[in-house]
From Swiss-Prot:
The keyword DNA-binding applies. Coiled coil: none annotated. Gene3D superfamilies: Nucleoid-associated protein YbaB-like domain. This is Nucleoid-associated protein BARBAKC583_1239. Belongs to the YbaB/EbfC family. Homodimer. It is found in: Cytoplasm, Nucleoid. InterPro entries: YbaB-like_sf (IPR036894), YbaB/EbfC (IPR004401).
Amino acid sequence: MNDMTNIMKKAKEMQQKMQQIQDEMVNLKVTGTAGGGLVSITLNGQNIISEVKIDPSLIKPEESEILEDLIMAAHNEAKEKISTAMAEKTQNITAGLPIPPGFKLPFS
């Protein structure tokens, strides 16, 4: 029974730490770039776009397909940075827990 109490205590501590991390992630801002910096997209920790910058040289009708690709690439880079930041923050919390390799937590 002592083991179960200990597990429940650790789970509650982990839940509190995860809430703290989620609160911190809201304030996180990361920027993904593409085309050597011609396009940049800034996301917050909830994957919401807060800023898009496009170099004026790309705003030409004949360049629209390139611009679309660069916007997607910049967005994907920024999302990957958010995922990496969350993984780094949760790694310390889940250390020592019997979580199988590759298992994704619902909040990460």
